[in-house]
Amino acid sequence: MQADFVIIGSGSAGSALAYRLSEDGANSVVVLEFGGSDVGPFIQMPAALAWPMSMNRYNWGYLSEPEPNLNNRRITAPRGKVIGGSSSINGMVYVRGHSEDFDRWEELGAKGWAYADVLPYYKRMEHSHGGEEGWRGTDGPLHVQRGPVKNPLFHAFIEAGKQAGFEVTEDYNGSKQEGFGLMEQTTWRGRRWSAASAYLRPALKRPNVELVRCFARKIVIENGRATGVEIERGGRTEVVRANREVIVSASSFNSPKLLMLSGIGPAAHLQEMGIDVKADRPGVGQNLQDHMEFYFQQVSTKPVSLYSWLPWFWQGVAGAQWLFFKRGLGISNQFESCAFLRSAPGVKQPDIQYHFLPVAISYDGKAAAKSHGFQVHVGYNLSKSRGDVTLRSSDPKADPVIRFNYMSHPEDWEKFRHCVRLTREIFGQKAFDLYRGPEIQPGEKVRTDEEIDAFLREHLESAYHPCGTCKMGAKDDPMAVVDPETRVIGVDGLRVADSSIFPHITYGNLNAPSIMTGEKAADHILGKQPLARSNQEPWINPRWAVSDR
């Protein structure tokens, strides 16, 4: 089997690549995907988002190594093992990122990836329903919309932010990210709208695109050039040949793993694993970044939360409403209001993110208390902690070794303590007087730095946004893995295009910038002139130097 382009992975970036590389019919494309079908209610029903992430059928099920700053807990690190990749099992939250994120990328060596460069690609990919005119795309393949916003708690959260003196944004994916507002989701007509829905499924209708279900073992490199991918299917090993290029879009865990299995990575580590070194790139697997979060939970004194729908019977009712009529609670991920805030004066861009949920539940989906409640997922999104991904052995089937090294920087502790205290201030506003009951978590008695730190060590979890392990940068940067055109430095005919190439984590959920990366990488691969830079100026809080709001 052969094709002009062989793409490893059908996730957020891989699906976009398949769609764009095959668009004019001139190139043949093969997409390699180990995971199975994304058709089924657990994936397609937005409200069922917790199910696919917890099912081995759809999830690689990775765990970190014991994290020393989190009581040696092994942190769950899910990645999609299904058509559509993690876009088929994620929370469907749509956040482009802040303009400062991408300007920082360019400062770190990713020339041509500043905000003015990437904004046109966001517009190209979007079909925004109700976004800010002039800042949003309206005819792209990816449907983006707000939820029904019927629960009064969503509005109470936004009003509380206003009362606390914070900004309100009408569209955080438009000109102004900072503030409280309504959250956007990748859903359409009551269904999850994944990268597979938006990109891969339409691409597969073309005669020049083929999806191959298989396990990718390694990239074949001959005389310094990637010529194909060694795969395993049906108990046999074979090679899929690439006439032009191989593109790795396998996630921030599996992309560096594949490079290292293929002999591209830190030479000493590869030799330790018994792998012949094809290209000594010390940055492969390094620079691992992620967002962390905790749940801040409160009892609701009014029976307005989703608590009544948690019993199995009522979940069945909601499921039936969705299955037969595509209406009711099932059509939304239930994250329908949010906030993007700055942690202190002198911080130019938002660095704290809130997802508001009108129910108090634990990570396993069970009620956090035997009562109505509400919660926010709170995270400091610009952590300075860095981790790495390495090989466990030379066996392609072995899970990678994942060390996030969470909370290894003192500033992370300061910022997360602030998150706890700031959330108490927000929930203490008049807008919540009608609903506010006792604090469930962290708990009223958790007040001092030491008490908050103890809570964080036990309750911080990943927000499932790993990135950075195949860093994009200048060719003379020894830790860069790919150049600004996504070419692997030191190997011809090979690119990486997914969240692993982010030089620095973006502020917000990573599905949107991952898809954008696939969109932009496709133009580089095809040798097209990049889309014209935008001259639009995003809103920056004029008080940023002197106030946090």
Curated annotation (Swiss-Prot):
InterPro entries reported for this sequence: BetA, FAD/NAD-bd_sf, GMC_OxRdtase, GMC_OxRdtase_N, GMC_OxRtase_C
Query: What is its pathway?
Result: Amine and polyamine biosynthesis; betaine biosynthesis via choline pathway; betaine aldehyde from choline (cytochrome c reductase route): step 1/1
Which Gene3D superfamilies does this UniProt record tie to the protein?
Answer: FAD/NAD(P)-binding domain, Glucose Oxidase, domain 3
State which Enzyme Commission number(s) the record gives.
1.1.99.1, 1.2.1.8
Q: Which residues form the active site?
A: H465 (proton acceptor)
Q: Which UniProt keywords apply?
A: FAD, Flavoprotein, NAD, Oxidoreductase
Q: Which cofactor does it need?
A: FAD
Question: Which residues are noted in the entry as FAD-binding?
Answer: 4-33
Q: What does this protein do?
A: Involved in the biosynthesis of the osmoprotectant glycine betaine. Catalyzes the oxidation of choline to betaine aldehyde and betaine aldehyde to glycine betaine at the same rate.
Its protein name is: Oxygen-dependent choline dehydrogenase
Q: Which organism is it from?
A: Sinorhizobium medicae (strain WSM419)
